[in-house]
């Protein structure tokens, strides 16, 4: 599979080296993480559509076959955060090649540390799978707050060739 390429001038690729300095995730009070089940696909799509609001994923009936049929998709690498009312508050959808495809937190749940906990969980899972690093792509203009989070987590910019 080809490496991701920057679709926009302000897109960057960031990397976290997985070493012995990793910290365990801390889930905010009233939220818990659980694994993905096929029945969660519609809610995950709705969250991604609401958060990214760019229409890039398309309708569910096109998105889900594309995601679930991708060679890098593993449902065990999709982490969901649920709030006290049972609603999907956040998610990290990761590829098997230690790449965070999507990280999304519902607008009502932002500012509580959910994204940071999801990233720390993903780092730990990939480290346990033997990965040396975790990568992601983000946009420095549209996702300035996310870039600050990633930098705080120790991620550094790397070349697209990786």
Where do the PLM segments sit?
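Conserved acetyl-CoA-binding loop-helix of GNAT-fold acetyltransferases
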Residues: 105, 111-128, 147-152
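Conserved beta-strand-loop-alpha-helix junction that forms the acyl-donor binding cleft
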Residues: 107, 136-146
